[in-house]
């Protein structure tokens, strides 16, 4: 008897909630038709609504990819003068980075000779000139080493690297010297 009263009470509660839920949620009638939304079609030759940057598009040029290969940082600038090189080396010394000098005789750009996937011998790693210049505080000392590297290898590309020994990463790299017939 108690079980039948309990089940009747549970059924009544369930029926009451089902009725309340049915009245709260509208039934799904499918997607609305597009007849209520007016669609205006613009003519294909109307350019008045296109975004504009005030005519600067005519001034933009693409960098020519043939005969003007680029290297690393600062490579879109003209070759750096000695004063500009001194300023760049002073910057990396002020940051606490260690200057390193590297050179490359044959392939100054990344290339793939042995495999299609990147590897150790694909032109990313250049030969280091002497040792990293630990404890160097004078940018002129770095440029003297660049001059020595130029005398030893006049046909080599020479770059200066700023190495952070705390994070153990290369932070800056720029070309210090390109040979006369260089790319």
From Swiss-Prot:
Transit peptide (residue range): 1-58
Note: The basic functional RuBisCO is composed of a large chain homodimer in a 'head-to-tail' conformation. In form I RuBisCO this homodimer is arranged in a barrel-like tetramer with the small subunits forming a tetrameric 'cap' on each end of the 'barrel'.
Assembly: Heterohexadecamer of 8 large and 8 small subunits.
Annotated InterPro entries: RuBisCO_ssu (IPR024681), RuBisCO_ssu_dom (IPR000894), RuBisCO_ssu_N (IPR024680), RuBisCO_ssu_sf (IPR036385)
A single Gene Ontology CC term: chloroplast
Plastid listed as a keyword: yes
Reported function: RuBisCO catalyzes two reactions: the carboxylation of D-ribulose 1,5-bisphosphate, the primary event in carbon dioxide fixation, as well as the oxidative fragmentation of the pentose substrate. Both reactions occur simultaneously and in competition at the same active site. Although the small subunit is not catalytic it is essential for maximal activity.
GO biological process, one term: reductive pentose-phosphate cycle
Lineage start: Eukaryota, Viridiplantae, Streptophyta, Embryophyta, Tracheophyta
Keyword Acyltransferase recorded: no
Protein name: Ribulose bisphosphate carboxylase small subunit, chloroplastic 1
Compartment(s): Plastid, Chloroplast
Family under the similarity heading: Belongs to the RuBisCO small chain family.
Keywords: Calvin cycle, Carbon dioxide fixation, Chloroplast, Photorespiration, Photosynthesis, Plastid, Transit peptide
PANTHER family: RIBULOSE BISPHOSPHATE CARBOXYLASE SMALL CHAIN 1, CHLOROPLASTIC, RIBULOSE BISPHOSPHATE CARBOXYLASE SMALL SUBUNIT 1A, CHLOROPLASTIC-RELATED
């Amino acid at each position: 008897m108690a079980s039948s009263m309990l089940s009747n009470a549970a059924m009544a509660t369930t029926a009451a909630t089902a009725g309340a839920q049915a009245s709260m949620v509208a039934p799904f009638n499918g997607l609305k038709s597009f007849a209520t939304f007016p669609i205006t079609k613009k003519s294909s030759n109307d350019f008045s609504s296109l975004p504009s940057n005030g005519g600067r598009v005519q001034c933009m040029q693409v960098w020519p990819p043939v005969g003007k290969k680029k290297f690393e940082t600062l490579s879109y600038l003209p070759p750096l003068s000695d004063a500009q090189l001194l300023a760049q080396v002073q910057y990396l010394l002020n940051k606490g980075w260690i200057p390193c000098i590297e050179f490359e005789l044959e392939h100054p750009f990344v290339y793939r000779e042995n495999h299609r996937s990147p590897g150790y011998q694909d032109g990313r790693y250049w030969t280091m000139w002497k040792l990293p210049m630990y404890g160097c505080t004078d940018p002129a000392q770095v440029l003297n080493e660049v001059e020595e590297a130029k005398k030893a290898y006049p046909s080599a590309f020479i770059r200066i690297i700023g190495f952070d020994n705390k994070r153990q990463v290369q932070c800056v790299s720029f070309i210090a010297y390109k040979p006369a017939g260089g790319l």
